[in-house]
Regions:
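Mobile, glycine-rich extracellular loop/lid and propeptide segments
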Residues: 2, 19, 24, 58-61
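Alpha-helix N-cap/helix-initiation motif
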Residues: 5, 38, 42-45
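Amphipathic alpha-helical recognition patches that constitute DNA-binding helices
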Residues: 11, 48
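C-terminal juxtamembrane segment of a hydrophobic transmembrane alpha-helix
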Residues: 21-41
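Hydrophobic alpha-helical segments, especially transmembrane helices
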Residues: 34-36, 47, 55
Length: 167
């Protein structure tokens, strides 16, 4: 009887090591896909927020006489409810149009899970207003808290918001 000195085939240890390496590679790929999905979601939210801010800015541009009323209306949550007069189908004053515009834009933002605010921009001397649109755990405010959008003229690193400087 002749005995073999060399091993033939693949041992169980080699197979397990290969499976472990494959599993680590697959986990890396899954993590990469997850980050890509997060980045896509963030981009979609930013585009929607920019569109909402642009919508309000264009409405303000079209109704400059109601400028002071826009900030007042958007800063008061009770004023952001649906406005009873439809200024698209009937004549409205500049103030009523501002009320209507704010209710329309805030309604769009709320439908997307976003909050809005409008305040005088920090760091400028010409009285320009900034439109804040925030989503997620961020509020459309300026401050030093974890949920604030900005601190003065700088975005907070954990915030998810967009600011547009306007009239």
């Amino acid at each position: 009887m002749k005995t073999r000195l060399n091993q033939n085939g693949v041992g169980l240890i080699e197979v397990l090591v290969a499976l472990l390496i494959l599993a680590i590679g697959i986990l890396g790929f899954v993590a990469l896909q997850y980050r890509a999905i997060e980045a896509t979601s963030e981009a979609i939210n930013r585009v929607q927020a920019i569109n909402i801010a642009r919508d309000l800015a264009e409405r303000i541009r079209a109704n400059r006489d109601g400028l002071a009323n826009y900030a007042t209306q958007i800063q008061t949550a009770a004023n952001q409810t649906n406005y009873t007069t439809n200024c698209m189908t009937s004549a409205c004053s500049a103030t009523a149009m501002a009320d209507f515009d704010v209710s329309q834009v805030v309604s769009k933002a709320s439908a997307l899970g976003m909050t809005m605010n409008m305040r005088t921009c920090s760091g400028n001397s010409d009285g320009r207003n900034c439109i804040y649109v925030a989503w997620g755990d961020t509020s459309a405010t300026d401050g030093t808290g974890a949920g604030d959008c900005t601190n003065g003229t700088a975005y907070l690193s954990t915030s998810t918001c967009v600011i547009m400087e306007t009239y």
